[in-house]
Each structure stands twice: as C-alpha cells, then as structure tokens.
Amino acid sequence: MEGAPPYATYGEIPREVGRALRNAHITPQSRDEGKTLDYANLCASCNTSKHTRNEKHCDEAQGSRELPVSPLQEDCISYFFFGSDGEILPNPKLTEEEQEMASATISILRLNSNSLITARKQILQETVNLIKELGKLTVLDRLFQRNAQGAFAPYYFVPLRHFQRI
C-alpha cells in the first residue's frame, strides 16, 4: 500500500473515530537513532491517551521495547488468533517460540486493552449477524474489498482471521 494507511497498524483504529494517527517506530528511536527517519521502520499508530484516558496501547505502550513480531512482516497476522470474546491470542498452530513472540508482542503493545477488545468483539458480532443474513462466503468475501479510498474496513482482519480466511 502506498503512503500511510488510514488506520493504526496493530490496533486498526480508523481515523473516522476521531483519533489522530502518529508515526510509530518499529525499532524504537532510543535503540537505533539511524532508523529515526527510515520509512521501512515506520508505521501508523493511534494516539491512545487522548481518547482512552490512561489505557495506553500500541506505540504509547511500546516505549523503547523491541517488537518480536513486526507489523511490517509479510506473515505478521499469522502469529495471532482472535477469540470470539475479542481477545487477541498467539496462534496455537505456531511453534512454541513463535507463540512466545506473539505473546510478547501482545503484551508489549497491550493489544488486549479494554477498548481494543470491545472493538474486536463488536466487529465479530456484526460479522456473525451478517453471516446469518447473507451467508459466510458472501460476508467474508466482502471484507477483502477495499473502499473508494483504497482502504479495508476497520478491523477487517479480525473476522477474517477468526474464521480462518487469512
């Protein structure tokens, strides 16, 4: 995708919900100042503290810690599984080492903060309701479609991953 996506990389919080996005560093600036302006080291991150009070997650929670699973890895999503309760978990099909990497990434970024769990749970419930109405294949195929701006729907990967489509 060219340019910055219209949503935060890990949290998938869209601009439309009123949260400002900021640049996050995959390798923290404090660990490698040479990567500060390296585009290959940047991703979009939400500004959490203004909207969730003290519930910091994603870039604000990361601080100077390294991420074991980079959001820029081609297979990044394969490290995670989304439970029907909205929680993000390590993919049980991975090796023990890979599960530990996923678990550490979830912990570092606080990807199971209340606001993210609530949002994921909501999209899963909406998807289940649509599946009952339209059928599983129709709904999941629609999630792969981009909007007029070229972006996927917020949290699109949650039901796709939950229903094992990606």
Predicted regions and their residues:
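Active-site-proximal cofactor/substrate-binding loop regions of enzyme domains
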Residues: M1-A8
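Short, surface-exposed beta-edge/turn micro-motifs
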Residues: P5, N41-L42, I77
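Histidine-centered nuclease catalytic patch
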Residues: T9-H57, G63
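C-terminal, charged low-complexity interaction regions
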Residues: E96-I166
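Intrinsically disordered, low-complexity segments enriched in glycine/proline and serine/threonine
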Residues: P5, R15, E100-S103
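Long, low-complexity, intrinsically disordered segments enriched in glycines and aromatic residues
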Residues: E55-E98, A104-L111
